[in-house]
Swiss-Prot record:
It is found in: Cell membrane. Residues 153-182 are annotated as: Disordered. Plasma membrane osmosensor that activates the high osmolarity glycerol (HOG) MAPK signaling pathway in response to high osmolarity. Signal peptide: none annotated. The lineage of its organism: Eukaryota, Fungi, Dikarya, Ascomycota, Saccharomycotina. The chain crosses the membrane at residues 13-33, 43-63, 66-86, 101-121. It is a multi-pass membrane protein. GO terms for cellular component: plasma membrane. Belongs to the SHO1 family. SMART domains: SH3. Residues 239-299 form the SH3 domain. It comes from Clavispora lusitaniae (strain ATCC 42720). This is High osmolarity signaling protein SHO1. Residues 34-42, 87-100 are extracellular. GO terms for biological process: regulation of actin filament polymerization.
Amino acid sequence: MGFRMANFLGDPFAISTVSFGVIAWIVAIAGAGSSASDNFPRFTWWGLVYEILLIIMVFLLYLNNTIELYKFTLVGLLSVGFLYTTNSTNNLIYSSNSGNLCCAAGCILLSMLNFLWIVYFGGHPESPSNQFIDSFAMKSSYAQQLPSEKNDDHEFAVPRSASGSQGFGVSDSRHSQLTNSKSGYMSSSQLNGLENFSHTNVQNTGTVGASNPASMPNTVYNTNGTNTADSNFAVPVSTFRYKARALYSYDASPDDINEISFVKDEILEVDDIDGKWWQARRANGQVGICPSNYVKLLD
């Protein structure tokens, strides 16, 4: 997948915790540097080096969007770091030296960060704590991946009828929402009915004819677990470049028609794999979005 800064910047939890860790480490290393060498625990130096390596590792894993593949490894490494920082705090906090106290304050902050990461990376994706943290990033990160004006292959035309309204009973306001290529954002309500589609639903010309809607193939779209057929819309063909295996079962939220449900070990076709939400297609042709921490890319 390659390193992409968007993977890191699209996750508020990653930005806030890594930034907090860097600041806490700077406080600790500044205190250590200003302390007298004969009055400073030497093993604390190794603890600080170990801690910055952990922060860099988490940052790189977020950049590569592979944090979920190594979260159990991180829990073990962070547990060791938690012991280092708490032990250093105990050795420094009772000192009267200002440098030692500054380093102790930094170690306390690093201990708090290590504990938070242990709880998050060690928790199940469906746990209340993880879902609460992920809720701040999931929806916003997927909105940034929606089609924009520069994705010409995703644009399509909704035909108008002779009376001036769109074919298949689409209103003027609805048509302007669906075909507006100047906006880089579309809300989930604007995407209703457009999420799930099959390759047979688009003619080779890239537009939909409205002269004989009864003869057009039905479009299959998501109803959160129940596939229904509707001929109101035809949508563009999307290429799914990757395959992924479901690590856990997932039930689509009834409040978001864009989500799809799937079961553990199911093979999905996915695309737009930046951020927390990926575009996915099931074997039955159902298309929508899935949380990236529930699936694993296959080679």
